[in-house]
Amino acid sequence: LRYFWTEHATALYMLHAAVYCLYIIYCLYRSEFFCFSLAAVFAGFSFYFYSKGLGMNARTAIIAIVTALVLAAVALLANRAAKSKGSVKLFGKTVKVFPAKFNATVLYVACTVLGCCLVACLVLGSALFAYYCMFAAIAIELTGAVYYTFQLK
C-alpha cells in the first residue's frame, strides 16, 4: 500500500496545483485563457501519465480519448463563439462565453499543437517523446500566460 500511495502522490500534488491555478485563471483572466489553460492542463497530464511508462493500455487510451475530446470541445467552442461575437447557444438560450472581440486563432493554434503532440505520442509510442511533449504543453501554457497578461486592461 505504501508503494502505490507514494507512486501517485506526485500526480495528486500536481493535480492540486493545476486545479488551484485554473481557479486563479478563471477568477482573474478572460474566459478564453481559462479554456486555453484547461486544454493545456489536460494535454500536459496525459503526456505526464504516458511518460511514466504506462504504455498503450486501456488507461492510456481513455486518457488520450478524454484529452482529444477536451481539445475538440475547446476548438468547437471557440469556433461557435467566433461566429456569433462571443456568444454560444446552449439549450435554446444564448450564453456569453467570450468577449465580443476575442482572438479565436490563439485557441485554434494551441489545440492544434497539443493535438499533434498527442497523436505523435500515440503513434511513436515513446515515453521519452511524451516527456518532451509535457514540456511543450508547459511552454504553450506560459506563452498563453504572457499573451493574455498583455491583453489585460
Please provide the spans of the model-predicted regions:
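Hydrophobic alpha-helical transmembrane segments and adjacent interfacial helices
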Residues: 1-4, 17-28, 40-56, 108-125, ...
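Structural signature of hydrophobic alpha-helical transmembrane segments
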Residues: 2-17, 64
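Membrane-helix interface "capping/anchor" motifs
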Residues: 24-39, 150-153
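Central hydrophobic cores of alpha-helical transmembrane segments
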Residues: 33-46, 134-137
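Detector for outer-membrane/organellar transmembrane beta-barrel domains
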Residues: 42, 59, 66-70
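Membrane-helix boundary/juxtamembrane motif in polytopic membrane proteins
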Residues: 55-65, 82-109
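Alpha-helical transmembrane segments of helical membrane proteins, especially in multi-pass transport
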Residues: 73-84
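C-terminal transmembrane-bundle signature of multipass membrane proteins
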Residues: 76-77, 94-153
